[in-house]
Amino acid sequence: MASPAPLVVFAYDFPHKKTYEGLLRLHLAGIPIALVIGAPFVQLHIRESAIRVAPAKLQFLSARHVCDRLGIPYVREAHNSPETVAALRELAPRVGVVLGARILSQEIIDCFSVGVINAHPGLIPENRGLDNVKWAILLGLDQGVTTHLIAGGKDVDLGRLIERQVVPVLPDDTLLDVHLRIQNTELEMMVRAVEEIGDARGKCGIEFPPFRDRGTYRACVPPEIEERLLEQFREYRDGWRSKNQREPVGEDW
């Protein structure tokens, strides 16, 4: 495979697990990065969940620190700002990737000749939006990851499909295990997607099919529904093995 064209990365300008681990994965995969755009912190006023699925109080190096050490160009700027648009138009990138971002504007997406890759922690289109691990449990959906070329406007978690992969749930899993396994799969699939379409002689975005169904976009799980999560998780975990025992999901699992 030929070397990928230099990549533009959308990241957060504060310590963030996916940003940190994603930059290291891309670097170790030998994928050149033309620019990392770190968005400043914004307070979102989202209700704090009563049931946590992610580890707490972990420390990560910031994107700026990683880029300084690896010699990667870095700028701190809001992703949808006029300054970012101007920088991207001058750079004329082929492919971008999201390692930390809010919703990107259509004007930003249009700066890329192929598109912007996102790794979503749920199976699209049936599990769009937020709290994907929890919604999958509550609705009886498979856990999984989807890589896609994002669409603009109101089509959040849609666009063009690159790959979908079901993530297994093991008999002794906790919610934290499932969450971390999904995050690990996101990074593996993100690098694979960049390698597949990042080559300047490789596939164009138009070659990837749009999603046939829009599915449903869901916000955070409401408290009155979330209170059923732990009880349903035990049933969900036991049922996953029964449903998939005849379908091998990979020797590592």
Say what each PLM segment does:
Residues 1-253:
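One-carbon transfer enzymes
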